[in-house]
Amino acid sequence: MATAEAQVNVNRNLQKQDLRNLEVSNLTPLSPEVISRQATINIGTIGHVAHGKSTVVKAISGVQTVRFKNELERNITIKLERLSEKKIKLLLKSKHQRHKYDIQQQKLLRILAERRKARAMTPLAPASVLAPSMETARPRLRSTSLNSLSPSNSSGYGSILGCDDSDQSSQLVLKPNVLKRRRSNCVQIPTPAAKRSRKNDGTTVKRRPKGEYIVEKIESVEVVQFQPVFFVKWLGYDVSANTWESYVNLSDCAEMEKFVERHLQLHQHYIAQITGELDTQLSDIPQTEDLKTISIAEIDAYDPLELQIDFILLAQYRAAASRSQREPERIGARALHRMQVRRSHFARRKQLIDLLLFEHRMNRVELPSPPIRVENNWDLDTIDSGFKYIQKNIIGEGVPKPQAGLVGCMCRHQSGEQCTASSMCCGRMAGEIFAYDRTTGRLRLRPGSAIYECNSRCSCDESCTNRVVQNGRKHPLVLFKTSNGSGWGVRTPQPLKKGVFVCEYIGEIITCEEANERGKAYDDNGRTYLFDLDYNTSRDSEYTVDAANFGNISHFINHSCDPNLAVFPCWIEHLNTALPHLVFFTIRPIKAGEELSFDYIRADNEEVPYENLSTAARVQCRCGAANCRKVLF
């Protein structure tokens, strides 16, 4: 078999080439090196031919067969096919495109150099200017990184994360200064996609806020101080500008969901083991104990991605057979806690749905009064499903039905004006004074006084000053769960002045005999909703309002030894002294957000006992007032 040296001696036209000095990018099909139809091959290790420029020469040249001996004097033959005209054109085209790409890269480098020079000449703005504040709102995407961030490599994740840039990741870890500089550049250099542009109609597209960048891909996740950090590739930036970002900077990013889903599938075997172990531990913790270590705010802020990321981190430790114990233990405890939060989160969602349904039913009944909002930011309780919200009293068995008005005032006919304190209005006709201030419409009576409003027999219309209770509630309220153990309460979302009508005490009107029987059961539960209609203290009350199962917003108003509401008896259509309306008015100015309360023990007449209460048990007062009596009844 002839050698390559023999062929050179036979063919005098062949030229000996030194491929180490050959500039491949300048070769064309007409180059002398190609026309010579010669290829000199650098020999590497046994059975291998060194790659590089020589390979390009062989591909462009038309050498059909090359024979040579390797270092062990073994003959090696390489056969090459002649390139077609089509392939030659494609090679020339690719060379032109490469040249065009090099020009674009040089232009981009010049632009970046000019920007760096311009930034060096101008002072840096504070961090609050470069990026939006975290307290106000969590931005969708931010490039702000953790300070001095360098992921832990104790678990050996580099081989199992599926990161395309593992070498770059390791370089960034070994050179924290370079990493910090990269992040600084990433924050300060605006992304090309952030530039202002114009639509076809000429309108300007709003520019993205400074400090926000688009995530192209999340490459991997590591652990820094027991918290996950993510290696992020930014859109419009080279991989050298990748940064490590905390979860808070990426929580609203769509790429985060893709990353988590991808890694859940990758580690599904280990995650199944981990979740099984944690479920066993969770089953040993009663759900009633959850709220002792978990707040409602934490439940509302529950993010399922955070729990899934903990599963991924634990799975990576197992997949890498890491010897580290401290980090997996801490992350495992955090995952168990988040599983508790998840369990309470499901109960919280059901609770919010139930409260919303009750709120809708209540406000439909209350129309056209202002809406009442329902909220519970303390525990997972809901409104008792046995409670029925009503707008008017239910007349029980043995209670006479009130009749329509038999007499009314003639103020409008006599003076031609509305009812006033000086006119012979309903109040004066009943032996009381006019109840409301004509200018403000607020109550001007002292607690314990009776209110007589105009009725259907009066000559005045609905705009009369003496028609307040019958026109309904005019102020919005909030039904909320208290934090002092008093159950549900009512507060006002806006300030209320003294003498403002709040609501009427609504429920079932029953006889006192029936009330005594019900009162025994209510006392055992430490709650009572019985309200005696005993304005006429000269004799025992005949009837009682029971708001335990049927009632309105007044059902939830709590007791206070220093109340801001008082109960007034009010007559409108009928004058049966045994069946007054029980109405609440403010007795002092009330601030927005303050809880509404009244004295259950009739502070206006301490000598009158609460007849329907047994003495078998004492209920502790939780009002917290300075003059608190400590015992409710």
Swiss-Prot record:
The keyword Ion transport does not apply. PANTHER family: HISTONE-LYSINE N-METHYLTRANSFERASE SUV39H (PTHR46223), HISTONE-LYSINE N-METHYLTRANSFERASE-RELATED (PTHR46223:SF4). Pfam families: Chromo, Pre-SET, SET. This is Histone-lysine N-methyltransferase Su(var)3-9. Residues 407-472 form the Pre-SET domain. GO terms for cellular component: chromosome, centromeric region; chromosome, telomeric region; nucleus. Zn(2+) 1 binds at C409, C411, C419, C425, C426. InterPro entries: Chromo-like_dom_sf, Chromo/chromo_shadow_dom, Chromo_domain, Chromodomain_CS, H3-K9_MeTrfase_SUV39H1/2-like, H3K9_Histone-Lys_N-MTase, P-loop_NTPase, Post-SET_dom. Disulfide bonds: none annotated. Zn(2+) 4 binds at C561, C621, C623, C628. Zn(2+) 2 binds at C409, C426, C454, C458.
